[in-house]
Structures are given as structure tokens and as C-alpha cells.
Amino acid sequence: MILLISDLHLQEERPDITRAFLDLLDGRARHAKALYILGDFFEAWIGDDAMTPFQRSICQALRQLSDSGTTIYLMHGNRDFLIGQAFCQAAGCTLLDDPSVIELGGEAVLLMHGDTLCTRDVGYMKLRRYLRNPLSLWILRHLPLSTRQKLARKLRSESKSQTRMKNTEIVDVTPDEVPKVMAAHGVRTLVHGHTHRPAIHKLVIDGQPARRIVLGDWDRRGWALQVDEQGFQLAPFEFS
């Protein structure tokens, strides 16, 4: 069994989500061959050198799962792209490139966080290119801690206000971008998060059936994609 999740946005202000995640680690994830976390694992991450006690506790929980035999893969999201190798080594997980193609359920599957599919959100795409530039990343990681904290708060506030103002179609994936990206990687299944719109979309690419599986965000309930001998099963679960 393989589990895929995304968009937990873990933060101290949401202990219910944290508890649900820890329950997953102690339950289904213990029986999984691998756990894939496809971005926005944390609500914010300003650097491996600035881990809070809360974030350290999550790191320790991941390490316990890794030590139990479950392989953990972590992909950057738009809110936690400063997660680095120091955190991954401590947590016992492997940092996964976005995008990545893996073998899953007997087929090649494309994994993405999903933000790069939202090409109609021109403002965000421009900001993303700037922030992910190697020079920008180096500067961000070397800013004083207080400056990084202020910048993170500012970016989060602006992101929330702009998302509320934007047309819902703009912040969703661009329909034409999906088949183009899937064809470029030679896959018939795409799994991503980011949009907070969980669903399994049936597609046709080059005359062949295909599908786009969108993982859900953890807010009022959790979401996980389970891949086993029964196939691909996307389902929510209630917080206990």
C-alpha cells in the first residue's frame, strides 16, 4: 500500500489537523510501503535553521515512521519551499523534485504539487519564478530570522487576500496545461494537490484514457489517496 497526501498546512493554531496527521502516522501509514507528501505540508517554513518546537515534534514523528520501515517522500509546496536537506535528514525522508515520475500501481504516474499548472494566475507565476530563482533562495535562507518571519507573514496575508479576490478559474489549473504536461512526461495519470479541490478527473490524451487525481486539503477533514491491489482510492476521513 502507498499513501499520498498534500496540503495539510500544519501549524500550531490547528491542533486538530496535527492530531489527525499523527493518528495517520500511527495507523495506516505504519502499514504503508511509502508515504508521499506533495507540498504545503507546513503552513509556513522559513528555513531549517528556524524550526520551532512544534515543527521539531513533527520532524520527530516522521523519523519514527521512517524508522518503522515506511519510506517517506516530501515535495515542496508554495508555502514550504524552503524546506531543505537538514530537515529531511532529521525526519528520515527524501526530498522529491517537482515534477517527478514514479511507478505506482503498475504504471508511470506524474506527481506534482500543482501550482505550476495554474498558469492563468499570472501574478502568482511571476512571484514564483522570482522566489524560486537560485539567487533568491540563497538570499532568503541568509536573511536574519526576524526578517524572514516578517516576510513570511506578509506573503501569507497577501496570498489569502488575493486568493479571495481572484476568479476561481484563475486559481485552478489551466485545462490546456494538464494534457500538455502529462504528454510531455509520457504518463496517463497525474496526481497533484494545491487547488484544494479533491476529485478524479477523466481525460483523453492522444486518444487514450487518462486521469488527473487532485488531493484534498486538510481543513474540516483529512484526505488521502491510497494505492493498493484495489487500485487508486481517493477518500476523505473525519478528524477524531
Swiss-Prot record:
Manner of cofactor binding, per the entry note: Binds 2 Mn(2+) ions per subunit in a binuclear metal center.
Protein name stated in the entry: UDP-2,3-diacylglucosamine hydrolase
Source organism, top-level taxon: Bacteria
Single GO BP term: lipid A biosynthetic process
An example molecular function term from Gene Ontology annotations: manganese ion binding
Catalytic activity: UDP-2-N,3-O-bis[(3R)-3-hydroxytetradecanoyl]-alpha-D-glucosamine + H2O = 2-N,3-O-bis[(3R)-3-hydroxytetradecanoyl]-alpha-D-glucosaminyl 1-phosphate + UMP + 2 H(+)
Functional description taken from the UniProt entry: Hydrolyzes the pyrophosphate bond of UDP-2,3-diacylglucosamine to yield 2,3-diacylglucosamine 1-phosphate (lipid X) and UMP by catalyzing the attack of water at the alpha-P atom. Involved in the biosynthesis of lipid A, a phosphorylated glycolipid that anchors the lipopolysaccharide to the outer membrane of the cell.
Record gene name: lpxH
EC top class named in words: hydrolase
Subcellular location as annotated: Cell inner membrane
PANTHER family (UniProt xref): UDP-2,3-DIACYLGLUCOSAMINE HYDROLASE (PTHR34990:SF1), UDP-2,3-DIACYLGLUCOSAMINE HYDROLASE-RELATED (PTHR34990)
Transmembrane segments annotated in the record for this chain: none
Membrane topology: Peripheral membrane protein
Organism (species): Pseudomonas entomophila (strain L48)
Keyword set, alphabetical order: Cell inner membrane, Cell membrane, Hydrolase, Lipid A biosynthesis, Lipid biosynthesis, Lipid metabolism, Manganese, Membrane, Metal-binding
Residues that coordinate or bind Mn(2+) 1: 7, 9, 40, 196
Binding positions for Mn(2+) 2 per the UniProt entry: 40, 78, 113, 194
InterPro entries: Calcineurin-like_PHP_ApaH, LpxH-like, Metallo-depent_PP-like, UDP-diacylglucosamine_Hdrlase
GO cellular component: cytoplasm; extrinsic component of plasma membrane
